[in-house]
Amino acid sequence: MFKRRTLGFLLSFLLIYTAVFGSMPVQFAKAETDTAPAIANVVGDFQSKIGDSDWNINSDKTVMTYKGNGFYEFTTPVALPAGDYEYKVALNHSWEGGGVPSQGNLSLHLDSDSVVTFYYNYNTSSVTDSTKYTPIPEEKLPRIVGTIQSAIGAGDDWKPETSTAIMRDYKFNNVYEYTANVPKGYYEFKVTLGPSWDINYGLNGEQNGPNIPLNVAYDTKITFYYDSVSHNIWTDYNPPLTGPDNNIYYDDLKHDTHDPFFRSPFGAIKTGDTVTLRIQAKNHDLESAKISYWDDIKKTRTEVPMYKIGQSPDGQYEYWEVKLSFDYPTRIWYYFILKDGTKTAYYGDNDEQLGGVGKATDTVNKDFELTVYDKNLDTPDWMKGAVMYQIFPDRFYNGDPLNDRLKEYSRGFDPVEYHDDWYDLPDNPNDKDKPGYTGDGIWNNDFFGGDLQGINDKLDYLKNLGISVIYLNPIFQSPSNHRYDTTDYTKIDELLGDLDTFKTLMKEAHARGIKVILDGVFNHTSDDSIYFDRYGKYLDNELGAYQAWKQGDQSKSPYGDWYEIKPDGTYEGWWGFDSLPVIRQINGSEYNVKSWADFIINNPNAISKYWLNPDGDKDAGADGWRLDVANEIAHDFWVHFRAAINTVKPNAPMIAELWGDASLDLLGDSFNSVMNYLFRNAVIDFILDKQFDDGNVVHNPIDAAKLDQRLMSIYERYPLPVFYSTMNLLGSHDTMRILTVFGYNSANENQNSQEAKDLAVKRLKLAAILQMGYPGMPSIYYGDEAGQSGGKDPDNRRTFSWGREDKDLQDFFKKVVNIRNENQVLKTGDLETLYANGDVYAFGRRIINGKDVFGNSYPDSVAIVVINKGEAKSVQIDTTKFVRDGVAFTDALSGKTYTVRDGQIVVEVVALDGAILISDPGQNLTAPQPITDLKAVSGNGQVDLSWSAVDRAVSYNIYRSTVKGGLYEKIASNVTQITYIDTDVTNGLKYVYSVTAVDSDGNESALSNEVEAYPAFSIGWAGNMNQVDTHVIGVNNPVEVYAEIWAEGLTDKPGQGENMIAQLGYRYIGDGGQDATRNKVEGVEINKDWTWVDARYVGDSGNNDKYMAKFVPDMVGTWEYIMRFSSNQGQDWTYTKGPDGKTDEAKQFIVVPSNDVEPPTALGLQQPGIESSRVTLNWSLSTDNVAIYGYEIYKSLSETGPFVKIATVADTVYNYVDTDVVNGKVYYYKVVAVDTSFNRTASNIVKATPDIIPIKVIFNVTVPDYTPDDGANIAGNFHDAFWNPSAHQMTKTGPNTYSITLTLNEGTQLEYKYARGSWDKVEKGEYGEEIANRKITVVNQGSNTMVVNDTVQRWRDLPIYIYSPKDNTTVDANTNEIEIKGNTYKGAKVTINDESFVQQENGVFTKVVPLEYGVNTTKIHVEPSGDKNNELTKDITITVIREEPVQEKEPTPTPESEPAPMPEPQPTPTPEPQPSAIMAL
């Protein structure tokens, strides 16, 4: 224990300190590199009291001062008047994220006028003020002092004046903390306040108390805490576990599909290959681990146990492993089931199911995906890394004006619209009500004259551009310009040419080394086709199906069975379009429509084969197919399609049009490529860097790490030949032009500025750099390279702007395409992520040791591709495991040169630009061959390694781990001998070694074969095992066995010998004359094998260590037991010896019955229902004269046994779910009641056959409280209503809740969203942002049901909602103000009558507005605080009428009552005559 220095010493020190340093204050200034992470200012209704305006986020008067370490302060310049206030902190003068705190405002109460200091910490988002919190002064901040200081680099041990382990209160809760990386070891420490011992606290928070011990078992990060109120001191260090604790540490669980240590090999695997899956847990945390996987092909779920394979080198983690292999192609979905005592955890994929690091949950959540593909799957070598060019034929080039106007009609008898001006915009009937519209209002009937001859004329242009594959949109006869509505599959459309033109184009392309892919549309035809003939235009040919139906007999048409026409003449049209009648399915497949299958697939000249080999001339045929709406045609059809084209051109491309994960269609029996829209969307999300709806998908900004995760997700799911042949597009005929996505549209006055174009072009160039450097087949949509712009269909199909091209952009594309073509490494080199942080993404490609990723021979080459979407910066890229030091690179774009030094390469990247670094030719990048005969010999305190010399090796590197397959650490380098002795080992631990060979240039070979070693003390003897006496059976009466072990140098020290393993073995010998029938179960074979349990150290016995273990015998009769010990992880065992000290000795004892010999009463086991992937058992309770101990569950594959015990449950449990079953397999079960004396009574036997049963999936959703009464729907990839927002209407179950039950097959990978009947009313995120599709895997959670509980945050059509008052509300004259109450999205800028304020965390806001008499108009405006988004910007006007006050009439005064006077009599006058008059009243 540390002893305090004497007072005299301290006084002497202080005198010297004062004399030397005098008046120098002790300062704890922030580091120079600690710059403010943001501008923070306090805003609230106090601002007007200091000469500002309330809630002014743009104020420069309340900007907080940055103090370092994330801390900010602001003190009011004057005293605030007494009263109540509200405030919060705004960042960067914006309400983005809703301010800090995000939930509501903070209150401030002042009893008297006061100056107030506000405190904020950026790192913890904590806010407070001086009325609630008083910090410890800087000079008195607590600090850690002790033997730990030097270990963590915090000054000299036990010297507070040198301690840099300063603790800070990051959350303003009077708890100060400090975090450090602490090496393994034993330490003692205390906490002092300030740089002296004047005030210090030790164990239990006692002032001047004892030192605090800290025993750290492995290198780890530890946070130290000090409570300034209680003075308690603690850490967050969790010492290693020693056994089950009914708890699983979720934060320590890990499975990373992108890390070969956790999943090897990476990515999709071939049939017959073995994949190794591993999961990490806190050491000693798990009692068992299993993997549960669903097989998409067999439709079964299987559980396989995992085995513990070792621990991490620092002892912090343990690892469990399972190996799987499949001899058939399939797609596997897996998760882990982890148990520790009574606790069960599940570990599956992350919420987005992108692979990589997963997530632990209490219930089954998301599955990881594993693709198993046919080992024979391949693509043509010319396809891997080729550059594709997609052409929409009518819009590319007019090479033959004579065929421009050969059509009289388009669809039916609609007219054809021919353009005279090549540079016209396509007719867009959406614009028919706009001024200047000149079209005819008919969709897809306008033509420009582009044709096959035009493509032929431009082949040299394409060759010069670097194109090696052309993909043609449909060219067969059709009434429309897009030609996805085929009229005749056997003919080239007359506006495009004829068969001879086609053959010439194919031959000319092939002569230039260019392959051609055709577009096949086999889900539907045109209603105006020779096959359907809705309009009766082809009556001179064979009768069309529709005309035959009209004649009352559809079978009269040779095409009659292709379509299903209902009695009323209706039929299924693709996505509801009656112009596109769908080919029907029989028994789930179009292939079962024989005449259709023969026409497309089976006949010698079937369409699938003919156009690859027209008239027997392969050179005059195309080279493969792109296949439209591939997922809307039965897979069986495509399997036969593949077999057919393989007879003409083996492995010819079959490119599927699929917009999501296509892995299930890429297993090897059909498609071998896909239109990679996943790639497109990820690249756009990264580069565009803002939310944008392109008509197909809403893009949301992501950083480089998320980009890498999404790209790696594709890489790991697709078979390797497919991944290197995917059609990596940025745009197509179905998407908005990429230049317009990036912000430029020449025909839109809001997007056609030079500034917009410059920015869009920079973004496009950046995307092209990524596209041309990445594995796959990059695809250019015609004209993109020339600056073509255009919005949604049909605007994305403008004519190629010949003569008006963007020459600079064309030259750039030519350059970047040819960089790819000239460097094989960019085509078939391997792929490794090198840097993914913020705005910068970098990946590497390699051909080393003379082999590419497919094992083909090519010269060595290395490439590094870097893209930067942000500001200019210097990027340090770690190349330690990628390429050796000294390799020189040249940027093929800029010409700059770079060299790898000290394991990194530093690349300067300008804003919105990139680099393609190619290693200079002539450098030696071929490493020596790997060592194959490494050997290890274990000794006491050392491991001896040896191997044979390798050609060209000048030295060797030694690597060490504790588990096979990874976690290697280099422990020695530049070893020049072919032997090595490792003495830095701990006896009793397992080590794994591998060695690499290094040549004179520094090229390092692959790892050698792995060898295990177990250095250990030698065990000399084990014995002194006690004799167990006759034992009475009982659940609470265990047998205790003791034994001793001696190992020189290990057990002769005080305490337990390190890493010694001790185990007790026991087994049942026989009844020994006892009546054991009460303990037995009929049909269960008595286990007479040894059972081994761990023993624990209980103390020293001289030079020996003493161990003890317990077990509970459950049968009367004779039992045998023995103890064994191992000092080398169980590689060798020493058993307890007899009296001679040499012979292994097992001892026996007798177990006799207790006084309770009465078995439990019988129990009834119910017949289980049929469930998928599980059997649920239920039984009646059993009783006993003493007590029931529990129930044992037994299982067999035969009714007569043998039965095997699979579980034991407590006496209060009357059910059990067995998930270790296979659908379709028969199982038998019995349940046995066991009492406290192990008397047993068995139930009846039941038979169960789990099988695939549709699962009732119950979707419950909670919607915002302002949701209108128009209902809620669930839309997704349901087969019966594919992404239909008005289908699947839910039932209202509460004020804000809806529910629906759908029947789905187990294993279904469902994606869905909630809407209110329309995509205009789809759900949104809490910030109003677009959210990703929700995803679930359908599983049986019990009783063939699954419950999904979701919450909708917001709706697209309601960015703001006003609860009250309603528009045109009338209030009485006495109401002089009214409260506006509403709800809006987080981070919104809300103003009411141009006055801004902040909404609460849940989006609710209230604002009181004054009312004048009469009509009051309140203007409410909301908009996002970041980029403008029209969808999130809305204005609402609320009219409130305040009644005028009622004007009361003045009352008529009442005279006082007086007696009326009596008039004197008067004579009656005689009036003079008067004219008539109207008396005015």
From Swiss-Prot:
Residues 1250-1357 form the CBM20 domain. Residues 1452-1474 have a biased composition (Pro residues). Keywords: Calcium, Carbohydrate metabolism, Glycosidase, Hydrolase, Metal-binding, Repeat, Signal. Ca(2+) 1 binds at D245, N247, D285, D340. The record marks D734 as: Transition state stabilizer. Residues 927-1018, 1159-1255 form the Fibronectin type-III domain. This is Amylopullulanase. Its cofactor is Ca(2+). Residues 1441-1451 have a biased composition (Basic and acidic residues). It comes from Thermoanaerobacter pseudethanolicus (strain ATCC 33223 / 39E). Changing E657 to Q/D: Loss of function. The active site is at D628, E657. It is an enzyme of class 3 (hydrolase). It comes from the Bacteria. It catalyses: Endohydrolysis of (1->4)-alpha-D-glucosidic linkages in polysaccharides containing three or more (1->4)-alpha-linked D-glucose units; Hydrolysis of (1->6)-alpha-D-glucosidic linkages in pullulan, amylopectin and glycogen, and in the alpha- and beta-limit dextrins of amylopectin and glycogen. Substrate binds at H524, R626, H733, D734, D793, R797.
